[in-house]
Amino acid sequence: MSTEKINLLDFDRKGLRELFAQELGEKAFRADQVMKWIYHFGVDDFDNMTNINKQLREKLKQKCEIVAPVVSEAQHSSDGTIKWAMRVGDQDVETVYIPEEDRATLCVSSQVGCALECKFCSTAQQGFNRNLKVSEIIGQVWRAAREVGLEKETGRRPITNVVMMGMGEPLLNMKNLIPALEIMLDDLGFGLSKRRVTVSTSGVVSGLDQMTGKIDVALAISLHAPNDKLRSEIMPINDRWDIQDFLASVRRYIASSNANRGKVTVEYVLLDHVNDGTEHAHELAQLMKDTPCKINLIPFNPYPGSPYKKPSNSRIDRFQKTLMQYEHTVTIRKTRGDDIDAACGQLVGDVIDRTKRTAMLKAAKGETIEVKAL
């Protein structure tokens, strides 16, 4: 008989209620009480749950546990950004806390590595190892909330937004993504507004269609090219689902969504003399004319061994102004945490299968390969 304890972080409210009924013989309200202790107060010791009777606390200690990823390393940027390496099993993923004047955003990983092989992404060069469990996804948020300080004792702004833009493709981990999102939104969980939780995808149409009508959060799409030829060159997933398939799926999702207010966020990494020409801007503007959107331009953050460069400021400015001629809303993402390699394109993970990474390391003459946040 297995003696492994059940990690309560692996369950959303529905799952936790079922667990309490089937494994503990307890009513739903007891599950709700425990869930509130875990997420509202950051408690991971059953003995500290003071409104739970002793008999139930003993049953919980015998059969269950509350185990989140632990911080194995923390780096602090001069701009307030914090990058945590979080230990999941025998590997690390990275989670980034980004404070601003009116919010604090947490960038969360969904996989160890990534299988999509986007050419500008060093996560892809490391290869794919495994999906994160529910407890390892929501546990990043739980741990970060503890680190930041639930009662503001650290002076840091509490987490107000979560973006699934860390290591991995979220929609290739739907089984564990959905319950984690449910906990983020649940009033007994983190109670975040659906407009403050964002899922980013590189174009996994099957996953996006699965989300449609099932869970409502903000959507960001990693587009990065205005035509299929160029997109297939830098993002091989385009050979499975081309741009028109992708955008049709996006329109289906936002039509059923309140969180997106009828618009999708388009992420577009600018690669010097690859996808950043005026002709690309015109093509992108035409491409998106039937899909209500706001376009977020991301100047490429180089990593050692990368074949791409960041465009000049003049090219970035020209690209933005060209798009704005078509009355698109266009922003340029401000680089945050680049001094600790926590900017978009610079997160460093720990992946066991390093076949691709080893080759990249040799090509970079021994320099560390870095990992992006989508």
Swiss-Prot record:
Q: Which InterPro entries match?
A: Aldolase_TIM, Methyltransferase_A, RlmN_N, RNA_MTrfase_RlmN, rRNA_lsu_MTrfase_RlmN/Cfr, rSAM
Sites where the protein binds [4Fe-4S] cluster = 114, 118, 121
List the keywords (alphabetical): 4Fe-4S, Cytoplasm, Disulfide bond, Iron, Iron-sulfur, Metal-binding, Methyltransferase, rRNA processing, S-adenosyl-L-methionine, Transferase, tRNA processing
TM spans (from-to): none
* Short name of any one Pfam family annotated for the protein: RlmN_N
Other facts: Reaction proceeds by a ping-pong mechanism involving intermediate methylation of a conserved cysteine residue.
Q: What is this protein called?
A: Dual-specificity RNA methyltransferase RlmN
| Organismal lineage | Bacteria, Pseudomonadati, Pseudomonadota, Gammaproteobacteria, Vibrionales
